[in-house]
A protein has these predicted regions:
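Canonical positions in the second alpha-helix
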Residues: 33, 71-72, 105-106
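Residue-level detector of conserved catalytic or cofactor/ligand-binding positions
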Residues: 505-521
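Short, conserved micro-motifs composed of acidic
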Residues: 20, 85, 92-97, 108-417, ...
């Protein structure tokens, strides 16, 4: 009798935490309720196990989630949706054989279920994908990592000498542990690379950017003067949802972040911002109504007057599963992570490349960029296919860490410099790039007056540099096909419209005046 009363007390606490989205605390209470309940009360035990499994999923405690689902199945409390969730967790443990068995059982009852279909494809093909491998190489970057979590790296600086990322390490602000994750709330940290290429010890970003709440998954505008980031506030009385906030940089310091109101829907989450290379669109993750299920990737236009309308990216990017962490390669390729497409388990990274008609074509980059765990948050070192990403592979606690990646490839790119004729850089300039293959881009200029862009062989390009107060400057370029990477350098010295221009009058011929009749006007 005493055990039963104790279990009810734990259950009441667990349901309260669950309603607030505090999954770590909820899982702890559900586990205690489960332990205090007699095995003879099979229905109760099975229901508690289901709640535990759901909370463990949310906190990335994969092995605990698998064990909880097995208990729910043992007590005959798991329906086919629970069996589907169990199978998807098995993928994350690389137990592909058992996962395939579960997916087949689900498909016997729900033959049209997209997640079960894609899950079975994953379970049947992942071992071969891992065996085949790819040209990617990955390496764990311990210089950035701690005994807690680090994720969503973002390279910054004119020479990509800064790396921003989120971490829940001890140096993060706040003293209380999060009821959602069981760790300290995350803060934005930064590491800087010296002239010898050595990265410094990460430090929390000073100023008003970080708070006692969770800050994470940041992105920068093309001019790197605006930061978009995810913030998760908490409240003991009602659930709070992730939101996107913005911070402006004054000199070297980031200011206090302010809310970016994407819609007036306060019951949906908005997270994982990414800015398109042309600076015209903000991509983000949300569970707002109108999606394909789970978390979807959306976008909203950025204008001088504010935000435009919101668009769901739709198929083939979004699925009934979760699509998250959009990022861009400078060439316009969209990278994102999903657990709804066929993959190796957990969140896999996918590449969405627009074809000539503007529709996206998806590519799975394979192993080792992807693994059975969660892989996400790509950032690139300029035009090169190298940089950093985050993954919780090989971490028993499910915590994310930062890895480097590189995929050697033949790249032809142009690097340009826009400056005054006197020599000073013009970071306020814009460069328009037009190719005879239909290319029509507006390129942003960095703080040192430079820009970079990948180009295709056998295409004739025209580059036009413009800046308020200066005359335009045009350059033309055509790159031949080559067997190795090559960089073309273009110079754009702009003349001021106020600077005096010397004219040699001896070169001007003045003819005799002609008498005009009224009809000649």
């Amino acid at each position: 009798m005493l055990c039963s009363c104790g279990a009810e007390k734990n259950l009441k606490k667990a349901e309260k935490y669950l309603a607030l989205g505090e999954y770590y605390d909820a899982a702890t209470q559900f586990k205690q309720a489960y332990t205090k309940t007699s095995p003879k009360e099979r229905e109760k035990r099975g229901q508690y196990a289901l709640k535990m499994a759901y909370c463990y999923e949310k906190t990335n405690s994969v092995q605990k989630a698998v064990a909880a689902y097995r208990n729910a199945i043992r007590y005959n409390q798991a329906d086919m949706n629970h069996r589907l969730a169990y199978a998807r967790q098995l993928l994350k443990t690389a137990d592909y054989k058992q996962a395939a068995t579960e997916f087949k059982a689900v498909l016997d009852s729900m033959p049209d279920n997209t997640l079960a279909k894609n899950g079975l494809v994953s379970a049947q093909n992942a071992p071969q994908w891992k065996k085949e491998g790819s040209r990617y190489t990955v390496k764990r970057m311990d210089v950035f990592n701690s005994r807690r979590a680090e994720f969503s790296p973002v390279l910054a600086g004119d020479q990509y000498e800064k790396l921003y990322f989120t971490s829940t390490r001890n140096e993060a602000q706040g003293n209380e542990l999060s009821g959602i994750t069981g760790t300290k709330p995350g803060d934005i940290f930064v590491s800087e690379k010296d002239d010898k290429g050595k990265w410094s010890k990460p430090e929390v970003v000073e100023g008003g950017l970080n708070t006692e709440f969770d800050e994470g998954a940041c992105a920068l505008s093309p001019d790197q003067r605006e930061m978009y980031l995810t913030q998760c506030q908490t409240d003991p009385s009602y659930p709070r949802y992730a939101q996107i906030v913005t911070s402006s940089r004054a000199d070297a310091s980031w200011g206090k972040a302010s809310l970016l109101e994407i819609t007036r829907d306060t019951l949906s989450s908005y997270a994982h911002p990414a800015v398109s290379p042309d600076g015209q669109w903000l991509y983000f993750t949300s569970d707002m109504p109108g999606g394909l299920g789970g978390l979807d990737i959306w976008r909203v236009r950025l204008t001088s007057a504010g935000l435009g309308g919101v668009e769901n990216l739709g198929e083939p990017i979004n699925t009934p599963g979760d699509e998250m962490f959009p990022t861009f390669r400078p060439n316009g390729d969209l990278y994102f992570s999903s657990n709804g497409h066929p993959g190796m388990g957990g969140l896999d990274i996918y590449i969405a490349k627009p074809d000539k008609s503007g529709h996206y074509v998806l590519e799975h980059p394979g192993y080792p960029l992807n693994s059975q765990a969660d892989d996400f948050g790509m950032t690139f070192e300029g035009v090169h296919n190298r940089g950093y990403f985050s993954s919780n592979r090989n971490d028993g606690r499910g915590w994310d860490h930062i890895y480097s990646f590189e995929n050697p490839e033949i790249i032809q790119n142009v690097k340009g410099w826009v400056y005054e004729q006197d020599g000073y850089e013009l970071p306020a300039a814009q460069v328009y790039m037009i190719g005879d293959d239909g290319t029509n881009l507006k390129l942003s200029v960095k703080g040192d007056g430079s820009f970079e862009q990948v180009i295709e062989p056998n295409v004739r390009y025209i580059f036009l540099a413009t800046c308020k107060g200066f005359l335009n400057h045009k350059e033309e370029l055509r790159a031949d096909k080559t067997e190795e990477s090559k960089e073309y350098v273009l110079q754009f010295p702009l003349a001021s419209i106020t600077a005096p221009v010397l004219i040699d009058l001896s070169l001007i011929h003045i003819s005799e005046p002609t008498r005009r009749t009224p009809l000649s006007y």
